[in-house]
Amino acid sequence: MASRKGENSEMEEIESEKNGSVVGIWRTLDASANRSAEAVRVLEDILRFCLNDAFLSREAKAIRHELAVIFAREDLQARIRLRDVLRDVGVSSKVAKTPPRTEMRHVFAANAARASQSIRSLEECSRLVVPAVTASFEQLRYRIYSLEKAAMTIITSQNKLADISLCVLLDVDQPQTEFKMLVAKLLAAGVKMIQLRD
């Protein structure tokens, strides 16, 4: 019962703010927590099931679990108690047009941006009500940036190699004129990748 009493006094203190700015901060933390967890889950799924990258999918999973540990902290539970979806003015607003996501890289990039932006919001708002977690959010945001860079490098490389059905290995130890003629013939025949060997 003492816990319930403490919870009620915390809520009264939060709700007694004249302009509701503290309530707004908690609601921002709640929305950003949900957004970041959802986005990181999408990143993890793409890394695991589309790229089959064990290392990067483990990193995404670790980030997601670290976020969950932070969100479970007792000093962050006011965000859930102050959740008010029915009066959220942004629930019914729609953007005019979302850019088309026709490839997996578009989905990955959009969710990496969503994750880093929402974690940045968590970082900034937590400074005002639970500064003890701010540094953790900052560190996680930088890890998202690194994860995005590594994954996009892999995705770009895979896209470049997707069209290549034949790779020709050429020995460079031959006269230069013959070598140039052979390369020209291979390119004219549609070869898209040539590897040079000594």
Where are these regions (language model features)?
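Intrinsic disorder/low-complexity segments
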Residues: A2-R4, N8, R197
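Structural preference for solvent-exposed beta-strand-turn elements
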Residues: G6, E10-N34, E38-Q158
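Conserved N-terminal beta1-alpha1 strand-loop-helix module at the mouth
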Residues: S146-D198
